[in-house]
Amino acid sequence: MSLALAQRLQKAIQKIPKQHPDAILQLNEGASEADFSALEAAIWLQLPEDIKEVYRVCNGQSEDSAFLFAGQEWLSLARIGEEWSVWKGLYDSGDFPNEEEGQSAPDAAAVRPLWWSPKWIPFTHDGAGNHLCWDFDPSDEGNTGQVIHYYHDDALIEL
């Protein structure tokens, strides 16, 4: 199953120049095992194999590249670690409101109602503090690794 996800990504990337000839897509070379080890040590989590397979194909994109995800930069493993560290620092310093004040979208019962969790791993960035994240801390109704849209200045989290 994980290889299928990586293959689908490759096929989608191959279509971009045909569908958007003006887009300049600059993808990074695939990640190494050392890249995975460094990130996993930093975030205290083991990445699932399907995510690793995707990052073995492309380790995110250049900051100068056209966005692969609508309006957001696809982060390399190193940039994931950097972004996660910023959020973890804010979390550790108590900058987030009481967890009970966080909320997810009404249709996103699968997401814990938190302002932020150290187990939300950002893999995109829009330049304004908003991310798509892998959610490794879902509610009982959610799935580990589900993708959530995190807004830095709003308690609304979308699945």
Feature locations, PLM:
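Low-complexity, glycine/alanine/valine/leucine- and proline-rich hydrophobic stretches
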Residues: G129-D153
